[in-house]
Swiss-Prot record:
Signal peptide: none annotated. It comes from Saccharomyces cerevisiae (strain ATCC 204508 / S288c) (Baker's yeast). Belongs to the DUP/COS family. The chain crosses the membrane at residues 4-24, 26-46. It comes from the Eukaryota. It is a multi-pass membrane protein. This is Putative DUP240 protein DFP1. One of its GO terms (cellular component) is membrane. Keywords: Membrane, Transmembrane, Transmembrane helix. It is found in: Membrane.
Length: 179
């Protein structure tokens, strides 16, 4: 916010110098300053990350419901549903394109990374299991409610499955174990 104020003051000082040279009228200086500050405020408000916990839980549940592949059309459906949710919840001003499917997928990956331990695969029987370092489970997830923990676990499991299937289909001769 301080940077914003310094930015506005710099513009105001520059415009005042131009005004004194007779190029701009006082009304034009005021309009330019107000218009510029409104543009900067709009950009700032749209660049803030969504911090609504319900939004995160809804995204995880969408992933669990649709079970998307890495490059699948399911991400378009999930993205559409999330954009509609953001609009209806008042977190975005229009129902159009807060996320594209690539941004939504990246947001999802960032959401599950570090919040819950990675799902790993037992190469003997190719069944997913969770490897939780002793101190990680107690420290990172202690403030997350059980439903969200379950959603994080299940979504991470689905993501690991999708990644495995993707690479298996890309390189079938390598011998990646079937899931």
């Amino acid at each position: 916010m301080i940077n914003f104020l310094l930015f506005v003051l710099t513009i105001l000082a520059t415009l005042t110098n131009i005004w004194f040279s007779g190029v701009l009228s006082p009304a034009m200086v005021i309009r330019i300053c107000l218009g510029g500050s409104m543009v900067v405020l709009q950009i700032w408000s749209f660049s803030r990350p969504i911090s609504n916990e319900t939004f995160r839980t809804k995204l995880l549940l969408e992933v669990i419901t649709h079970r998307p592949s890495i490059a699948g059309k399911e991400w378009k459906t999930i993205t559409y549903n999330m954009n509609q949710y953001l609009f209806k919840a008042g977190l975005w001003k229009t129902p159009y394109h807060f996320f594209c499917e690539h941004q939504c997928y990246e947001f999802f990956k960032d959401l599950i990374k570090g919040k819950y331990p990675d799902v790993q695969w037992d190469t003997a029987n190719t069944q997913p299991f969770i490897s939780v370092p002793e101190n990680q489970a107690a420290t990172q997830n202690s403030d997350v409610e059980p439903t969200v923990k379950w959603c994080l676990f299940k979504a991470a499991e689905i993501q690991a499955h999708a990644v495995r299937e993707y690479w298996q289909s890309q390189y079938p001769d390598v011998g990646i174990p079937a899931i």
